[in-house]
């Protein structure tokens, strides 16, 4: 059966609750260069945003940001046991995979995306992964969503995006796709 529809999913907060994974990874990475981050600040200012957006808010310069991000990516898999899977969304994706292309569009790194998908044995469900390294413009820019639609030759009208964050929803709106907002699970 030829597919002509597409489902795009965000990673953090949509497919997985990774708040603790990311918080612990960043907290430990920041500690290595003598910085600290409080949980409430992380939730409000950092989670779901690109590291170059929030790390300057705690006083890091460009070089320090790159060091912290590199350390964070290295530490990420040590905290995967803290992640929670959105089993209902994954069940829906499993039911849809014969009629829809399924792609991940995330601002997370490819390394961290692959690690969590492999940890939960869900990597094979995705026909395409567009990670932070694959785009020039991060969400709220729709580049990642548009790239996925172009890859599969599927129109925005035949695309459904699952997103949780304001920037992700803004990017989905700009792409012209249909949107379902994922709430806490």
Model regions: which residues?
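Metal-dependent phosphoesterase signature
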Residues: 37, 56-94
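Glycine-rich phosphate-binding loop signature in dinucleotide/nucleotide-binding domains
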Residues: 1-3, 96-100, 152-158
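Short glycine/proline-centered loop/turn elements that form peptide/ligand docking sites
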Residues: 90, 94, 165-171, 179, ...
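Conserved SAM-binding loop
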Residues: 15, 102, 137, 161-162
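Helix-loop "lid/cap" segments that line or gate small-molecule binding pockets
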Residues: 29-30, 49-63, 116, 148-149
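Short, acidic loop-to-helix structural element flanking the phosphoryl-transfer center
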Residues: 78-104, 110, 114, 142
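Substrate-recognition "cap/lid" segment bordering the active-site pocket of phosphatases
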Residues: 109-160, 166-174
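Active-site neighborhood of HAD-like aspartate-dependent phosphohydrolases
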Residues: 1-44, 174-175
């Amino acid at each position: 059966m030829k597919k002509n529809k597409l489902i795009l999913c965000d990673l953090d907060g949509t497919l997985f609750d990774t708040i603790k994974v990311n918080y612990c990874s960043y907290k430990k990475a920041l500690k290595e260069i003598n910085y600290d981050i409080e949980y409430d600040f992380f939730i409000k200012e950092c989670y779901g945003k690109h590291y170059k957006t929030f790390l300057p808010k705690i006083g890091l310069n460009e070089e320090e940001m790159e060091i912290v991000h590199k350390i964070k990516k290295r530490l990420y898999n040590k905290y995967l046991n803290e992640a929670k899977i959105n089993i209902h969304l994954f069940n829906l994706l499993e039911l849809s995979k014969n009629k829809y292309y399924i792609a991940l569009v995330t601002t997370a790194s490819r390394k961290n995306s692959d690690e969590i998908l492999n940890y939960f044995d869900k990597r094979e469900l995705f026909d395409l992964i567009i990670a932070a390294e694959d785009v020039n413009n991060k969400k709220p820019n729709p580049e990642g969503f548009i790239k996925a639609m172009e890859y599969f030759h599927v129109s925005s009208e035949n695309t459904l995006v699952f997103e949780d964050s304001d920037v992700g929803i803004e990017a989905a709106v700009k792409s012209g796709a249909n949107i379902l907002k994922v709430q806490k699970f």
